[in-house]
Amino acid sequence: MSQISMFVRKLHKFSYNPNYKFKCGLEIHTQLKTKYKLFSLSPTSYNEPPNTKLSYFDVGLPGTQPLLNPEALLLALKASVALNCDIQSYSSFDRKHYFYADQPLGYQITQHYYPLAKNGYVQLNKFDDMPDKVISLEQVQLEQDTGKTVNYDDRINVDLNRANTPLIEVVTKPDFENIDQVQAFVRKYQLLVSHLDICTGDLETGAIRVDANISVNNNPRVEIKNLGSSGEIVDALKYEYNRQVTLLQNNGKIIQETRGWNGIATESLRKKENAVDYRYVPDSELPVIRLDKNIQAQLQNTLDELPDSVLDRLTKEPYNLQLAHARNLLFQPEILDYYENIFGRIRDANKWFFHELLAAFAKSDVEFQVDIVSPDMLVDIVSSVEKNEISLTGARIILKHIIRNKSTKTLPQLIKELDIGKPEASAELEEAINEICQQIINTNADVVEKIARGHTNALQVLIGQAMKATKGKVHAKEFRSKFMELLK
């Protein structure tokens, strides 16, 4: 059996050993959505050609000095408040010394001694499909990102576009008792920072990178660096837990170290450093940050409604949405705004929004866009159905036409163009309905036989054919009445 097959089988059968307690803490590095870098006026860059978005400071040119970007500070403060942290009135920057090719300064500017915020928490709950659980946070610190090293055959290339990009590092306490809690926390954190427009929230693009510190039975902790997806986090933690348990069962010793994840196993990178190894010193070129004592309350008033609050509101009266629908809206703010715009303006808004409008976009293989079917247009379409000016089928035809053709015509123009207005009641109309129904009955003997045996749902097949034949001009209830009369 190959190594990969054995690995997949082992993770698939994963379970916790009751004699070996899992404990985990996270360090989450989050790129802030700023226009410029943390300590220079270079634009932040994610998809540009290598080494094209740089300043002299970004590349560590001697004599250049850092200048703090206030936009990055504001986003870091907003994140700290959203994470229920205590904003510190005094914070400062420090130099973390180490040598690596992607760090041209020879040190990283971070906040080791006096971070921006401390003592936060995140509450896991029913909205995360989890029992209530509080995950405490040690601190939130503002720091600069490194560049990237890219391996090409026998060469290592360095791209410094990412160097000096603003980050926050969120450090949790080791409160995670299982991997499900870790996964739920990371999902919740992603949603929070993307919802507040602090970060894109993407793991796969590197906008969020996770380091996990795991220990078993309070033995020395092992850090797993740079986990870049939810799947990597889960698989790496499962593997590392099994590795440590196996080691302890065989009278081995866990050493404090840093390990990486290669897609199959964790592998040792280096002995775990401590603060002495990094030679932290205050950065003499950056002033300390002093904040007004009322800054926390002021920031609280500027935050958008937080995700849990939105979910709580949407799953209660008057919306009464299923949690899955509420989550989908929360992940797409533009669609949430649309939904709240039409709610209260039309009856049965949930049916029209989810089962008619979004379904019409999906069936047309078109991504939802507010300006294709405006809220006012949807309200007008529903109103026309309620006034019996068009049928439900007619409304569906109109929606499909608008979406596929990006039509900007008015509703009356569309009704006329598509010829789906309800015909005036007359003897001729009654005769036409009777004739259509009789013809459908004559050509669907098997369906008629099912109805005769008591399968009344089969009547819907006949009604559907009648609606199609009349382009939805006649309401389904009229066809239902006529079929029931003819089939007595």
UniProtKB/Swiss-Prot annotation:
Q: Where in the cell is it found?
A: Mitochondrion
Q: InterPro entries from the xrefs?
A: Asn/Gln-tRNA_amidoTrfase_suB/E, Asn/Gln-tRNA_Trfase_suB/E_cat, Asn/Gln_amidotransferase, Asn/Gln_tRNA_amidoTrase-B-like, GatB, GatB_Yqey_C_2, Gln-tRNA_amidoTrfase_suB_CS, Gln_synth/guanido_kin_cat_dom
**Keywords for this entry?**
ATP-binding, Ligase, Mitochondrion, Nucleotide-binding, Protein biosynthesis
Q: Which SUPFAM superfamilies match?
A: GatB/YqeY motif, Glutamine synthetase/guanido kinase
* Major location (coarse): mitochondrion
Recorded source organism is Candida albicans (strain WO-1) (Yeast)
Q: What is its EC number?
A: 6.3.5.-
Q: Which Pfam families match?
A: GatB_N, GatB_Yqey
| Function (record text) | Allows the formation of correctly charged Gln-tRNA(Gln) through the transamidation of misacylated Glu-tRNA(Gln) in the mitochondria. The reaction takes place in the presence of glutamine and ATP through an activated gamma-phospho-Glu-tRNA(Gln).
Which GO molecular function terms does the record list?
ATP binding; glutaminyl-tRNA synthase (glutamine-hydrolyzing) activity
SMART domains recorded for this chain? Answer: GatB_Yqey
Cellular component terms per the entry's GO annotation = glutamyl-tRNA(Gln) amidotransferase complex; mitochondrion
How does this polypeptide assemble, per the annotation?
Answer: Subunit of the heterotrimeric GatFAB amidotransferase (AdT) complex, composed of A, B and F subunits.
Annotated GO biological processes are: glutaminyl-tRNAGln biosynthesis via transamidation; mitochondrial translation
Family annotation (Gene3D superfamilies)? 1.10.10.410
Similarity comment: Belongs to the GatB/GatE family. GatB subfamily.
NCBIfam families in the record: gatB, PRK05477.1-2
Extra facts: This protein may be expected to contain an N-terminal transit peptide but none has been predicted.
- Can you say what this protein is called? Glutamyl-tRNA(Gln) amidotransferase subunit B, mitochondrial
Q: What EC class is this?
A: ligase
Q: Which domain of life is it from?
A: Eukaryota
Q: Which reaction does it catalyse?
A: L-glutamyl-tRNA(Gln) + L-glutamine + ATP + H2O = L-glutaminyl-tRNA(Gln) + L-glutamate + ADP + phosphate + H(+)
